[in-house]
Amino acid sequence: MLTITSYFGFLLAALTITPALFIGLNKIRLI
């Protein structure tokens, strides 16, 4: 159970961090 919950937590974190990184890169490119 712990491995499944930690996996979903990691997946959720990746889904939230990845778009943030793309937005940051786009802002840097615009500047």
UniProtKB/Swiss-Prot annotation:
Q: What is this protein called?
A: Cytochrome b6-f complex subunit 6
The record's section on PANTHER family has: CYTOCHROME B6-F COMPLEX SUBUNIT 6 (PTHR37266:SF1)
Q: What processes does the entry annotate via GO biological process terms?
A: photosynthesis
Q: Per its database record, what is this protein's job?
A: Component of the cytochrome b6-f complex, which mediates electron transfer between photosystem II (PSII) and photosystem I (PSI), cyclic electron flow around PSI, and state transitions. PetL is important for photoautotrophic growth as well as for electron transfer efficiency and stability of the cytochrome b6-f complex.
Q: What Pfam families does its record include?
A: PetL (PF05115)
Outline the subunit composition. Answer: The 4 large subunits of the cytochrome b6-f complex are cytochrome b6, subunit IV (17 kDa polypeptide, PetD), cytochrome f and the Rieske protein, while the 4 small subunits are PetG, PetL, PetM and PetN. The complex functions as a dimer.
Q: Give the primary localization class.
A: plastid
List the residue ranges forming a coiled coil, or say none. none
Q: Which GO terms describe its molecular function?
A: electron transporter, transferring electrons within cytochrome b6/f complex of photosystem II activity
